[in-house]
Amino acid sequence: MRSFHDCLPRDGAAKIISLISHITLLNEEKEPNALSLIKDAAFAIIAGDCMGAYKLYHDCARRLLLSPARRVSGDMFMDHLIWLAVEREHAFAKSSARGELDEALLMSFRSDLAALGELASLDWHDIYRMCAERYRELQAKSRYARDDISVMSSAAWTGTEPRPKPQQKDVPLPGDAAAPLPPPSESEWLSWSYGEKEPRGEYAADEVLEEIYIRLMESPDWRGMAEDLFNLFASSGSGIFLKTRLLKCAGGTLGLAAARHEAVALSVQDNAKQALGERIIAFMRGSRPLPVLIHGPKAIGKTELALSMADEFPELRAVIIEPMAGADVHRLFARLCAQPLRFMLLIENADAYSPLWSPLLCACTGGGLPDNVLPVATGTSASGMEEFVVKIAMDKLELDGFVNTVKELVEAQAPYLQADMGWIRNASVDYQLDAHDELNIPAAKLIAQRYMAEHE
């Protein structure tokens, strides 16, 4: 087929309408969306409503700017098409993540990929060109409209019978109030292009995604990517699970968790880290998940320890969870169970005696726990948590351990500084006497910050 870059305006607009109307599985359910607005703009071009097409184009551009699509290709429209096929959690992605190859979905997925691949050759300048050329066509038609005398003259010249002129609506002449308005100049159309071809940000599945992105951007036919995308979903999950290793479930809704600073390996946590690591390794190898409880004084680094361990296993995702109703817990379990990944369910500050926590804790220790979910709870006490059969104790920090922790924090954050152990010990003693507070990880971070500020 002729590309969008050199086709006639009506032909190009008709092709846009045909391709978008053809998309079934990968189109967004809610309208108006980016594709439906571009389709409406194409209808407006055919009708000669250039200003209407201009408005619809910018409505689409607004959707593209606010789209959840990752910035990858340097073109907002291409990014949106890639998002529809790869990052959006559509029916084919969900079934593939479960390891199911549904032939009907695969057939529809291939067909939609073919349409998206053709649409990927469309750029913003094509829409502008179609509008401008369509306007010129209508202007020429109105300028050279044939009257009855010209029809009879043509017939006499060619020696044929004059054909009756078809009935048609009067074409407005230039300057008439009903005449089509010219499209704005090219500089007034918001460009879809924004930069270089490179993925912005970091995704959990980037090792596989980057090759997928390159092939989609370079290939004119996306149908051949169906099997590769099936393998992506079947190994790395779908939707939000491609994006991050750290999630949060609040109110029954699973979403991205706030970014956390990379944890520093602390020697005071070595024993707890080894014990938790052994359980996670066994879990990753397919052993039955045994609920884990990490207990100890407040602010001793229990949550940071668990999250740091999750970072060490590429196929492990951490889900920070809040108290929720039993029905919400089972919906969460069903969603996690439908993914090919393994999950650490992090339950912070669990309270076995609170009715708010009861549905979640019961679900984590009952028979409905999925095989790919490992509950890890943190708390100040092991009382009432008998069902969490693996218990890891973390002791409170004594002065020597606290001083060493401050030293390790300084060395990790400012390796160019030499830690003055005398200064650190004196500051630690002063803090303990002045604040009358426990020596804990936040206090160690505070003193480390003071040391770096004074010695830099």
Predicted region positions:
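Conserved nucleotide-binding/hydrolysis micro-motifs of P-loop NTPases
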Residues: A325-A327, D351-Y353, T380-G384, K396-F402
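Conserved catalytic/switch belt of AAA+ P-loop NTPases
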Residues: F333-A338, L346, D351-G384
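Pre-Walker A (pre-P-loop) alpha-helix and adjacent loop at the N terminus of AAA/AAA+ ATPase modules
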Residues: A258-V292
